[in-house]
Amino acid sequence: MARANRGEHSTLSTFWQSRHNAASFDPLYRRIDVNAPEPSDSATPEKTPSKHFIRQAIDADLASGRFDGVATRFPPEPNGYLHIGHAKSICLNFGLAKDMGGTCNLRFDDTNPIKEDTEYVDSIQEDVRWLGFEWDNLHFASDYFDQLYDWAEQLVKDGKAYVCDLTAEETREYRGTLTEPGKNSPHRDRTPEKNLELLRAMKAGKFKDGEKTLRAKIDMASPNINLRDPVMYRIAHVPHHRTGDKWCIYPMYDWAHGQSDSLEKITFSICTLEFEHHRPLYNWYCENLGIHHPRQIEFARLNMTFTVMSKRKLLQLVKENHVTGWDDPRMPTLVGLRRRGYTPESIRSFCADIGVAKFNSTIDVIRLENSVREHLNSVAPRRMAVLDPIKLTITNWPEGKVEMMNAINNPEDESAGSREIPFSGELYIETEDFREEAPRKFFRLKKGGSVRLRSGYIVDCHDVVKDADGNVTEVLCTYDPETKSGEDTSGRKVKGTIHWVSREHAQKVTVRNYDRLFKVENPDASSDTGSFLDHLNPDSLTTLTAHVEPALAEAAVGDRVQFERLGYYVVDPDSTDGEIIFNRIVPLRDTWGKIEAKGKK
């Protein structure tokens, strides 16, 4: 029976632990509410690509003496779960620090208490550690609220910031457009003394939400809209998850981000490409405060086929019950991929494989799927499972005889050893592996044909049993005792090999065959009147009862295996002592590629 208790060890768990040391062994993580795995040692991407443009820029800055070391950070906002796109940033920032003997901080940009929660703080830390990284320092932007406020007063005193009474809607109207300059706020020319008085009144809670803002005084005619007197502070009488009710004004992201980098002595602030036009503002704040000035470098964010990455859309999927939660195995979240059975090694390898680019592009999800196939092919033990069974009876098998067959655990790894599988006169095979009348190139079992049973014997089909509707319910075969795998003396050659389980000894399990959540490459490119939800794949989950070999009866949560000839599977946390549940990670081959190829013909 399945054991969800991670302190217990099954045969498969023992197998996995013998294959990996503590840093790489990964029992599948819990559903969001159970203990996280132990932090692993600092890890680096599995592949070492040639130097990308960010590495070249860092090398140049170090050579010129602009900086004397590498200090990076991963700065998520704790308002949701991380997804595969964040994994790219994590691998990049932590990987650069590791490769170059530097440091990498984990900093939570917790400047918006309306959307943030400690649940996300905890889950993000778990995800970073699960990927194999450990931060040098853990920080929160809220740790710097006092210093940020002091610097705001400094800019006010210097005449470089002012308190504005415009509403949010009026502020947008005054900002202008990409083709039209903005207009100065009617409050832009207040004296520094008056602005300081108003700012302190804002801090003291004397105004309502949205009544006033603090804005930087830069240039309302700038071609860069981000420099048109950006808001630095807004009023929000909302308790903060760390500071409580101490503050009723909160810094905007652009104001908090660069200054937090500066306080932590970050040297390279690596951001995704959408922040490229924010870089002049990042620089303006550092220069006008006269503080340590990190270099901001942007790279292309990860976009992937058959996937949506928008936090808003992912939230919609959860809220409208299109998925079971943030950790649904069809979601691109790290908690979802983790529950699906993806390994941290495969995700790091994927991030290294796709590289770092300056321009946005879309990566084929096949590359992510292939990364986990490649990793699990080398480490996952093989087991036999029949998902859609039909009975196969060996008519010349001695009655009551059970023979133990020796089966290799992993042909890619000799040290993985072998196991014993019971073989009897009544077996289950896959329904699709038999045809009463088969096409010419059907090399599996057919009436009048022969096939090898993996790790067993060659069998010859001589008849079938049908029900009242004419459906085949049983396949009748004889076996050739001279053809036992590993001891074959018959000299017979057959073209097909199929898997099987002994009917008497098979264990019943639940299998969840997960597939891609969307049926089109780009769900965001919806029709004029439609929505990305119109492209949901109705067949993204199929649940069935399967029959598996006895070795899987003791499978524990997190055990990953290859169901021979079918795909890679992992034991789901929903498993109980009475029911083992296997999630399909990926099939052995890219079935979508075949479907698309047929569609193009």
Curated annotation (Swiss-Prot):
Give the organism the record lists.
Rhodopirellula baltica (strain DSM 10527 / NCIMB 13988 / SH1)
- Short sequence motif 'KMSKS' region: positions: 308-312
Pfam families documented for this protein = tRNA-synt_1c, tRNA-synt_1c_C, tRNA-synt_1c_C2
Q: Which GO terms describe its cellular component?
A: cytosol
Kindly state which reaction or reactions the protein catalyses. tRNA(Gln) + L-glutamine + ATP = L-glutaminyl-tRNA(Gln) + AMP + diphosphate
According to the lineage, what is the superkingdom? Bacteria
Q: Where is this motif: 'HIGH' region?
A: 76-86
Q: What would you give as a GO molecular function for this chain, any one?
A: glutamine-tRNA ligase activity
Tell me which UniProt keywords the record has, alphabetically.
Aminoacyl-tRNA synthetase, ATP-binding, Cytoplasm, Ligase, Nucleotide-binding, Protein biosynthesis
List its EC numbers.
6.1.1.18
Any one GO biological process? glutamyl-tRNA aminoacylation
Protein residues bound to ATP: 77-79, 83-89, 272, 301-302, 309-311
What residues bind L-glutamine, as annotated? 109, 253
User: What is the name of this protein?
Assistant: Glutamine--tRNA ligase
Instruction: State the compartments where it is located.
Output: Cytoplasm
Give the family per the record. Answer: Belongs to the class-I aminoacyl-tRNA synthetase family.
Subunit record text: Monomer.
Q: Is the keyword Aminoacyl-tRNA synthetase assigned to this protein?
A: yes
